[in-house]
């Protein structure tokens, strides 16, 4: 593994590459959040025959903080991704997005129309805030009454204190990561979540959307993306199975896999199944 920094207009961007000497089309991994960070666990294993690149978006993980929180916008993250691809000299690349990283990947294809992106892998895909909100409301309605009450009162009063946070964690244990306990690296990643980025772009939790992405919706635009697409979700994923199926049907050239007994972070809950699915898609690419 080699790591370094890329100088961009917004600041220094951290990156790492595994399998740099391999010959197949490189993977570039786009992490979720916004404000989360790259987690190589499980994903770096794809470096058997191809380079796998990770980078932390500005304001996240090991990259610089933006000097002004107004920097955090879809447009700037798309431009940043464009800079990263050019600086890493990835003439051909397969984009691999996780959650928000899927929205970023598709926004990049729609806005920049790059010639070098040969395929995209969308894991636990977030592509539409209205559809995301619909799925979360359906999940919340099935939670215990005390959890529903804490969430509803928190959202109504704008009080995201202890009761709301406790309810949020119960929801996360069911729909974000169902491992018990959570791996140390996942706990550490959540502790390093940049709340300024997350609140600015998203909101106080996965199901309360109040930031700049509140009206984000790529669903009507998906037919314009013509490269091969793989969509992956867990059977209890925040990205609901029916919604992901709708995404698949919207893309001209897409396939979909549902991982059993898995939620949003299905790549660490069911790593063997996840790797079989992705490796099959990557054959001859």
Please place each PLM-identified region on the residue numbering.
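Conserved HGGG/HGGXW glycine-rich cap/lid loop of the alpha/beta-hydrolase fold
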Residues: 10-66, 70
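Active-site loop/oxyanion-hole signature of alpha/beta-hydrolase fold enzymes
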Residues: 53-100, 276
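Conserved hydrolase catalytic core segment
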Residues: 91-135
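Flexible "cap/lid" loop of the alpha/beta hydrolase fold
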Residues: 118-162
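Conserved loop-alpha-helix segment in the C-terminal half of the alpha/beta-hydrolase fold
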Residues: 212-262
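Catalytic active-site module of serine/aspartate enzymes centered on a nucleophile-bearing elbow/loop
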Residues: 253-285
């Amino acid at each position: 593994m080699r790591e370094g920094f890329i100088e961009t207009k917004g600041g220094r961007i951290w990156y790492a590459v595994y399998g740099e000497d391999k010959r197949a089309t490189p993977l570039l991994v786009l992490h979720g959040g916004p404000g989360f960070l790259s987690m190589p666990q499980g994903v770096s294993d794809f470096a058997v025959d191809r380079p796998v690149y990770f980078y932390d978006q500005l304001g996240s993980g090991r990259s610089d903080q933006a000097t002004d929180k107004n920097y955090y916008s879809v447009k700037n993250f798309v431009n940043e991704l464009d800079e990263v691809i050019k600086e890493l000299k990835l003439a051909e690349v397969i984009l691999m997005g996780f959650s928000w990283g899927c929205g970023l990947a598709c926004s990049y294809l729609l806005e920049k129309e790059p010639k070098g992106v040969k395929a995209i892998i969308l894991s636990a895909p977030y592509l539409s805030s209205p559809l995301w909100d619909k799925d979360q409301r359906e999940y919340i309605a099935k939670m215990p009454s005390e959890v529903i009450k804490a969430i509803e009162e928190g959202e109504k009063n704008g009080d995201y204190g202890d009761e709301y946070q406790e309810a949020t964690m119960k929801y996360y244990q069911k729909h974000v990561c169902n491992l018990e306990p959570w791996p140390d690296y996942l706990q550490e990643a959540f502790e390093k979540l940049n709340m300024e980025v997350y609140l600015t772009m998203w909101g106080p939790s996965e199901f309360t959307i109040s930031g700049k992405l509140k009206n984000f919706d790529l669903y009507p635009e998906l037919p314009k993306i013509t490269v091969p697409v793989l969509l992956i979700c867990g059977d209890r994923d925040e990205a609901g199975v029916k919604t992901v199926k709708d995404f698949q049907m919207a893309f001209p050239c897409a396939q979909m896999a549902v991982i059993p007994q898995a939620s949003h972070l299905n790549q660490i809950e069911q790593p063997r199944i996840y790797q079989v699915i992705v490796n099959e898609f990557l054959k001859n690419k």
